[in-house]
């Protein structure tokens, strides 16, 4: 309960697109649903957020009484992702997901002579330098990354043109660079072609997997790289972090208000508390090792 309001959770797994399928059906039935059965609030992820925010199923954040000033400490990219084609903000997140290059400290010391982040960054400062370092890693018995798929999101986050221009498919130069660089690395045996999340891809979470680096945000190393499994690199604090060749983000979860809700005031309060309250934001960082969508809090903790 929140006050005198009963909170009813609808939890659907992501497997086989079940979450989106269920959400689609429920939103389509929103208008005819009984008041207590209507969706008030729902979550979307970065990969499919625009599908929902660019429809009338989501309310503009301003309709809830939330102002631009309320969200002034949030990172702009988190707003861009949930802004519709008319320039209207349709969602808010408590989370930021900036990505870094996680490197195997032992491999760095063995091959590069140091595991200091500032020094390691010199070996991965741009893609040409990264690819040269891959040769050194191969000579020492390591793959630079587990898979060519590890770097795709970094390249694709740094495109300067759209996929479709004037009704024609367009391949950005940075995507073509990923294709060329990946083929060179794969042909040289300096990376693999495993699917992300596969068992083969995950072997590098352990020393015997002989993988130098992965790309990801805080949640990857905290929750997805076997950090709680004895014998893994993460279990022993064996991953370091460097900026890498290019900045990028991966993931994130946004709160959207459903059109038709009769609880706008409560949704406003939830969003403001969850995404703008400095004390709550700091607690999330300290308690969960997460990166929050509040530049004041993050800069303060960094200092």
Regions found by a protein language model. Name each.
Residues 11-28, 125-129, 194-207:
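Short helix-initiation/N-cap motifs at beta->coil->alpha
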Residues 1-47:
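Early extracytoplasmic/lumenal segment of secretory-pathway proteins
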Residues 20, 31, 35, 42-100, ...:
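Hinge/lid segment of periplasmic solute-binding proteins
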Residues 28, 229-300:
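Extracytoplasmic/periplasmic substrate-recognition and gating elements
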Residues 49-53, 218-234:
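A ligand-binding cleft/hinge motif common to bilobed small-molecule-binding domains
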Residues 99-103, 108, 255-257:
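Short glycine- and hydrophobic/aromatic-rich loop-to-beta-strand nucleating segment
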Residues 40-43, 212-217:
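Paired acidic/hydrophobic, glycine-rich loop segments that form the ligand-binding mouth/hinge
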Residues 129-137, 166-199, 238:
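Glycine-centered hinge/linker elements that transmit conformational signals in sensory
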